């Protein structure tokens, strides 16, 4: 898996490539000037993390009134199925995910070789998976479960020695002073909505221990609104990385479009977020899942592709409405974890391939003067 360079000509070529890498590093340092070097390195060197989409939509499982909703992501079923807010909200009355076990999820992430977990604290539907003083529309006050799932996962991550990140949707279809549901999810943010978001972000960064990243999503903030949220995050937790979807160049790392991958090395800190199936992020009861081995190899190649281009890979699971992890997704993660136990040295703590050309046989990663050849 490793080659060493000895000839003078090869050393000269490597030095040229390392000079280009140095320029890349300078650019990255400029992009992350708001956070410490140590915080950036912890995030950048982890390479591989778990994304969890879990909420009221998990209870519906991509089905409304007995019929599969085939349009759009299942976590946005309220929008794509045209469900009235009151009807959708009634889902909370039966949402009681007794099989959600934060310790087991942390154990699965560690077995999969993942270094952190990012969970949806609130998606576009506005339903909060944490106990909040800002609204009763949350998993503690509005459901028979009466549980703070973010707290449970935060505690499990702390005891399990794995970092926690939080997804937070700026779009909020439940907040009365927010723009109503739209087809593009890029609505402007009213002053009242901004105040509401800041209050929730303050809770999330105050009540749940160290947070490795805050994964903002959607909405069209003004430059001032983005700046306010970015500065709030770093005031409360200076080492918390902020995702590029906050907008207006207020970020610590950029995020590719859903399930998209760059063709080359990007000149900044970046991440690809990927779902098991492109059609949805949350649980879909009628999803055709196919062969476990085929899916495992697909996502493993995606991980290698991202890391060889200098990025981090955030791979999603969508627990069922009862809180259990779909067995298919569990087996995929375990399969990737098995490969990483053998060859993780070619992934963790590495830098992007110094080569700009693509190879038929696979790709490379770099650690110091050592090149790792990963055959595909």
Model-derived features: positions:
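Mature catalytic domains of secreted/periplasmic carbohydrate-active enzymes
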Residues: 33-376
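Bacterial Sec-dependent N-terminal signal peptides
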Residues: 1-34
């Amino acid at each position: 898996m490793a080659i060493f360079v000895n000839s003078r000509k090869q050393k000269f070529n490597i030095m040229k490539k390392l000079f280009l890498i140095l320029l890349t590093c300078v650019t990255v340092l400029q992009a992350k000037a708001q956070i410490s070097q140590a915080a950036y390195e912890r995030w950048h060197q982890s390479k591989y993390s778990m994304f969890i989409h879990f909420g009221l939509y998990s209870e519906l499982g991509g089905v409304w009134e007995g019929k599969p909703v085939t349009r759009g992501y299942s976590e946005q079923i309220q929008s794509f199925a045209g469900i009235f807010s009151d009807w959708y909200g009634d889902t909370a009355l039966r949402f009681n995910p007794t099989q959600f076990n934060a310790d087991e999820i942390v154990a699965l992430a560690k077995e999969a070789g993942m270094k952190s977990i990012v969970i949806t604290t609130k998606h576009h539907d506005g339903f909060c998976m944490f106990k909040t003083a800002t609204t009763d529309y949350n998993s503690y006050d509005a459901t028979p479960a009466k549980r703070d799932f973010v707290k449970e996962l935060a505690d499990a991550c702390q005891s399990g020695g794995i970092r926690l990140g939080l997804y937070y949707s700026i779009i909020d279809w439940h907040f009365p002073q927010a723009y109503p549901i739209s087809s593009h999810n890029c609505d402007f943010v009213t002053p009242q909505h901004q105040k509401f978001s800041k209050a929730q972000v303050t809770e999330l960064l105050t009540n749940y221990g160290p947070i490795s990243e805050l994964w903002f999503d959607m909405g069209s903030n003004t430059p001032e609104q983005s700046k306010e949220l970015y500065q709030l995050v770093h005031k409360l937790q200076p080492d918390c990385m902020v995702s590029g979807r906050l907008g207006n160049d207020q970020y610590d790392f950029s995020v590719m479009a859903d399930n998209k991958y760059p063709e080359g090395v990007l000149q900044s800190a970046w991440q690809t977020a990927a779902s098991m199936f492109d059609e949805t992020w949350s649980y879909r009861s009628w999803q055709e899942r196919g062969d476990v081995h085929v899916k495992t190899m697909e996502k493993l190649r995606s991980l290698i592709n991202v890391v060889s281009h200098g990025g981090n890979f955030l791979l999603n699971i969508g627990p069922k409405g009862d809180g259990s992890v779909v067995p298919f997704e569990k087996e995929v993660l375990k399969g990737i974890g098995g490969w990483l136990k053998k060859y993780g040295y070619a992934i963790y703590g590495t830098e992007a391939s110094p080569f700009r050309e693509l190879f038929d046989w696979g790709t490379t990663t770099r650690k110091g003067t050592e090149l790792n050849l990963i055959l595909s």
